[in-house]
């Protein structure tokens, strides 16, 4: 039985790097993209894991805020408009994605202060006098 493995380890099930890191995003695919993209001559073993974790965190953050925006509008489905509202209303995400255009996102509702009707300074007492 030479060349058949070590017996106990031969029956082990393969565990993905995503599962080892406790991530949903594919670490192997991100590693492949990093290598294929020629960003550097060599890619460290931890780089794709870290990048997958960062991407997963940012995605979860945007999805949570977009879900809140959808719920505020009494909708069950997240559409690009909800993603736009979520990103633009959040200070840090707005800064990170300031130059990004979201298709079918629309614009933030905003009326310039000069265009708003003037507030009357006096109450009902001045009108009678």
Curated annotation (Swiss-Prot):
One GO molecular-function entry: structural constituent of chromatin
PANTHER family documented for this protein: HISTONE H2A
UniProt keyword list: Chromosome, DNA-binding, Nucleosome core, Nucleus
Main location: nucleus
Subunit structure: The nucleosome is a histone octamer containing two molecules each of H2A, H2B, H3 and H4 assembled in one H3-H4 heterotetramer and two H2A-H2B heterodimers. The octamer wraps approximately 147 bp of DNA.
Top-level taxon of origin: Eukaryota
PROSITE patterns: HISTONE_H2A
Gene3D superfamilies assigned: Histone, subunit A
Function: Core component of nucleosome. Nucleosomes wrap and compact DNA into chromatin, limiting DNA accessibility to the cellular machineries which require DNA as a template. Histones thereby play a central role in transcription regulation, DNA repair, DNA replication and chromosomal stability. DNA accessibility is regulated via a complex set of post-translational modifications of histones, also called histone code, and nucleosome remodeling.
Location of this chain's protein in the cell: Nucleus; Chromosome
Family stated for the protein in its record: Belongs to the histone H2A family.
Source organism (scientific name): Volvox carteri (Green alga)
Name the record gives this protein: Histone H2A-III
Gene Ontology CC terms, in alphabetical order: nucleosome; nucleus
Lineage: Eukaryota, Viridiplantae, Chlorophyta, core chlorophytes, Chlorophyceae
């Amino acid at each position: 039985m030479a060349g058949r493995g070590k017996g106990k380890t031969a029956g082990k099930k393969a565990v993905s790097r995503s599962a080892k890191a406790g991530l949903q995003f594919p670490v192997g695919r991100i590693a492949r993209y990093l290598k294929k993209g020629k960003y550097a001559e060599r890619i460290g073993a931890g780089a794709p894991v870290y990048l997958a974790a960062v991407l997963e965190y940012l995605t979860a953050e945007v999805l949570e805020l977009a879900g809140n925006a959808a719920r505020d509008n009494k909708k069950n489905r997240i559409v690009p408009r909800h993603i736009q509202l979520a990103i633009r209303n959040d200070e840090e995400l707005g800064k990170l994605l300031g130059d990004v255009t979201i298709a079918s996102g629309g614009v933030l509702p905003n009326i310039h202060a000069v265009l708003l009707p003037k507030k009357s300074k006096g109450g009902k007492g001045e009108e009678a006098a």
